[in-house]
Amino acid sequence: MWAFPELPLPLLVNLFGSLLGFVATVTLIPAFRSHFIAARLCGQDLNKLSRQQIPESQGVICGAVFLIILFCFIPFPFLNCFVEEQCKAFPHHEFVALIGALLAICCMIFLGFADDVLNLRWRHKLLLPTAASLPLLMVYFTNFGNTTIVVPKPFRWILGLHLDLGILYYVYMGLLAVFCTNAINILAGINGLEAGQSLVISASIIVFNLVELEGDYRDDHVFSLYFMIPFFFTTLGLLYHNWYPSQVFVGDTFCYFAGMTFAVVGILGHFSKTMLLFFIPQVFNFLYSLPQLLHAIPCPRHRIPRLNPKTGKLEMSYSKFKTKNLSFLGTFILKVAERLQLVTVHRGESEDGAFTECNNMTLINLLLKIFGPIHERNLTLLLLLLQILSSAVTFSIRYQLVRLFYDV
């Protein structure tokens, strides 16, 4: 049985501040509703018959509350150093890690809000987290600088027990930040999904950190909890308003904020591989979406499911294009995906010639293909259940299957 150790005072203070953050988030979002609408940061829910204007970019409120909690929390991990007799040397490396992590998250919230306001292109969406991750990588370089990994057992006869990746390790961490920020943004489009999946991931990380507090890397997991606990409660406050029927939209701001927060704790907490395992649905969704993201298959602006007004349920959305415009690679991918029952393809003739229509390649549409039309709230619940199951699989891999690859 897992036993959670007694929590240190800074974590209890962090928990108390996070509870206040939940109340603040729940209160501030409706209070600022009119301000966002007046600034035209609003839109219509495409999956509702109502054309009511709904405030967007509410992730900026959630992110602001999160930052205020942690700014106020900064002195508490170092309370012993306020009493000279209890502090032999100030832990500058811990302080730098805390400040650097906050800087990276703060930059990502700012850049995410800029994306919501300016509606940037996808190539810019890749550059933003790259820029915001630079403070994070510099903190890792100055505090740790370790780029050596333990090689899995099946490859040790070739590579040895340890392998120094050098600069490639920093490339990996930069790509991890880019992936985390965009993975949540790609798996989105229905009420409660962005905040819901982030809530499940953060809860899973909190459980993982608590289990590991009695291990050899206690300080790393305490550091992770400093961020995950306030993130969980502020996200819970956002989800309260974003749940079906949504009163607000979280915007790209929240997706970037959530992704960078996960990247920060995964990198500076030294559990990036476990972190990626918590993203199993997002990894699958990314790989499944890749043909459209790379435009091998035409990708419309919105790939969200479409509402059937008669049934009130969501159905698959489709991408329609001229068959002759599809490249050889796109044709090959589409045939393979169709053979594997991963897409539904319709072919026909129109006045403009032969056309092809296939469902948009997202995990949301794939579930609709498998289970048929589903009510939006139930579809969100199904996706969150999948996220919870993937976390259960992650814990099984981390504490059982890992023995096949590493000496634990």
Swiss-Prot record:
Gene Ontology molecular functions: glycosyltransferase activity; identical protein binding; metal ion binding; UDP-N-acetylglucosamine-dolichyl-phosphate N-acetylglucosaminephosphotransferase activity; UDP-N-acetylglucosamine-lysosomal-enzyme N-acetylglucosaminephosphotransferase activity
Keywords of the record: Endoplasmic reticulum, Glycoprotein, Glycosyltransferase, Magnesium, Membrane, Metal-binding, Transferase, Transmembrane, Transmembrane helix
Binding site for Mg(2+): N185, D252
Chain segments annotated as transmembrane: 11-38, 59-78, 92-118, 122-143, 167-186, 193-213, 219-242, 251-269, 272-293, 376-400
Cellular compartment(s): Endoplasmic reticulum membrane
Primary location: endoplasmic reticulum
A Pfam match: Glycos_transf_4
Regulation of activity: Inhibited by natural nucleoside antibiotic tunicamycin, which acts as a structural analog and competitor of UDP-GlcNAc.
Official protein name in the record: UDP-N-acetylglucosamine--dolichyl-phosphate N-acetylglucosaminephosphotransferase
Organism: Cricetulus griseus
Gene: DPAGT1
